[in-house]
A protein has these predicted regions:
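Conserved catalytic core of sirtuin-type NAD+-dependent deacylases
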Residues: 1-221
Length: 221
């Protein structure tokens, strides 16, 4: 299963992109980059603290809960790939998943590379590592950065070995995830899309269902 922003929208999570995502007249594309963090880490952390404050008020919805139930039914035959960084899948109870863009509740040391969970709100501006005292950054894949090799390997394995791929709430334009549906089709899988509206991949999937994830995903049970 592959999920995107559409599944979290039903929990009230904003996209943080476009006009609705402006913060102090900055776009996400202006702040979520290695260059922005190197230039002004304080500004970037202020933005992430703002996002964390918003996300702390959000809860998993019936679509997240259904995915957990499917995982419990299917066991190791299921793998969840999400583009979302809000942590709602984990909050719902999903365990077999790849958060390919990272998790906003996880930080990484820019010095020693140690990764740790952190739900402190707000984080101290310019938080530092307890081990080496170097600056911490969000453990998130920023614009211009590559996905982590282990996640890419695990996703490639899951996509090429699956019999069924469910694509829920994705725009179909952000790569490499935008290519997963065609990869699964080429490998012989049945591909079903659930989204509010048609996407660039709607014509290649076997079934495209339009509607809210929180309404349609529970029907899979």
């Amino acid at each position: 299963m592959l999920t995107g922003a559409g599944i979290s929208a039903d929990s009230g999570v904003p996209t943080f992109r476009g006009a609705d995502g402006l913060w102090r007249n900055y776009r996400a594309e202006d702040l979520a980059t290695p260059e922005a963090f190197e230039r002004d880490p304080r500004l970037v952390w202020e933005w992430y603290n703002w996002r964390r404050e918003i996300l702390a008020t959000k809860q998993p919805n019936p679509a997240h809960d259904t995915i957990v139930k499917l995982e419990q039914q299917w066991g190791d035959r299921m793998w969840l790939i999400t583009q979302n960084v809000d942590g709602l899948h984990r909050a719902a109870g999903s365990q077999r998943l790849s958060e390919i863009h990272g998790n906003i509740w996880t930080v990484r040391c820019t010095g020693c590379g140690v990764i740790s969970g952190n739900r402190e709100i707000p984080l101290p501006i310019l938080p530092t590592c307890r081990l080496c005292h170097a600056l911490l950054r969000p453990h998130i894949v920023w614009f211009g950065e590559s996905l982590w090799e282990e996640d890419l390997r695990r996703c490639d394995q899951a996509i090429h070995s699956c019999d069924l791929l469910l694509v829920v709430g994705t725009s179909g334009v952000v790569y490499p995830a935008a290519g997963f549906a065609s990869m699964a089709k080429e490998a012989g899988a049945l591909v079903i899309e659930i989204n509010l509206e048609s996407t660039p991949q709607s014509d290649l999937v076997d079934l495209s269902l339009q509607g809210r994830a929180k309404d349609l995903v529970p029907l899979l049970l």
